[in-house]
């Protein structure tokens, strides 16, 4: 059962890291610490999945996805999945995820009954935030017209940084923007998500 659930999740997101698989299987499926390696090995042996590298410095992808390397993995989704696995409390919340390449969204999901959209942004892509703000405001107008009081979505803006200066620059830009939509700023302290990076989160209601 655990193998099937994991395989379906990898199929949905296209790739996962070893750290993500370990966290998913232990936190949401109740596996002990040594079980994930066995499950990964078994699925690789069955050719259901494959690793981009022999060691744990690679990603796990579906066996039918064609040869992939670390370089052509969509890391936007990888970052968003780290966030979701940390924040989710139930398996259903994890399995609510939907990858997307529409509207600059990497991954959407439902947490505690609220709809989230996670977007990876670099410092030279801050225009994405304004596009999302406009879409949120339009969705609010539609909801008002339909007498629906539900918040359309909560944005998670993800960044990868190497230095404290980069983090300060991001926060300065947000302060100047004075963004008036529900959002979180999630700053990962790494630009290589192959192993789980530390991150800082700033939430604005």
List the model feature ranges, each with a label:
Residues 140-205:
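C-terminal regulatory/effector modules of DNA-binding transcriptional regulators
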Residues 7, 37, 82, 168-172:
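Generic detector of well-ordered alpha-helical segments enriched in charged/polar residues
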Residues 76-165:
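Exposed, interaction-prone assembly regions rather than primary DNA-binding/catalytic cores
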Residues 1-2, 7, 11-12, 21, ...:
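Extended tandem-repeat scaffolds
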Residues 1-69:
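Nuclease-adjacent, charged terminal/linker segments that flank catalytic cores
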